Amino acid sequence: MKKFLSVILVLTMVLSMAACGKKAEETQPVLSVAGTMEELLNKTIEQRPVEFMGGVIPVDLTDSSEDGLWALKSYTGLDSAEKITEAAAFEPMMGSMAFSMVLVRTVEGADSKAVAESMKSGIDTRKWICVEADDLKVAGFGDVVMLIMLNSDSGMTAQSFVDAFAKVAGFEPEFVM
C-alpha cells in the first residue's frame, strides 16, 4: 500500500511539474523571396512592362568610397549598407524620366520595416534634377524591401509595380507605405 501511494505521489508531482513548465515559443519564420535582386527586378518588369528602355543596375554594397556611398544613397535612400546584403535598381537608360524601382534584401534579423522607413525618408525624389517623382511606395515582402517612385504623368502608378512584385514574390506585402 505504501508503495502504491508513493507511486501516485510521484506521478502527481511529475504531472504538476510538467503542467507548470514553460511553453515553447512559437516564432514566425521570416518569409524570403527566392532569387537575386536583379532577377526579381527583371521578373517584375515582365509582369508590369514599361514603355521605355530601362535596365537593371546592381548596387555595390562593398564600395565605401565617396562615389559608392553616393550611389547607395541615390538608389536606396540609405546612408549605410549595414542592414542589407544585396541591392539593385531598375531605371531608364536614356532621357529624363522620373522612374526608379529598387529592391534590397535585409540581413538576417533586421527589421525590414525600419529599413523601409529609412529608405522612404532618405530617398531624393528629385534626384534627376529636371524631373521629380510624385508617386512613391515602399513595401516589405519578408526579407526584401521594394522602393518604387515615378512621376504620375507617365500613366503608371507605383501601386501597379507593388502588385506586380507581389505576383513575383508569391505573397502579398507585409506592409506598404
Task: Enumerate the language-model features and the residues they cover.
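Sec-dependent signal peptide recognition
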Residues: K2-V10
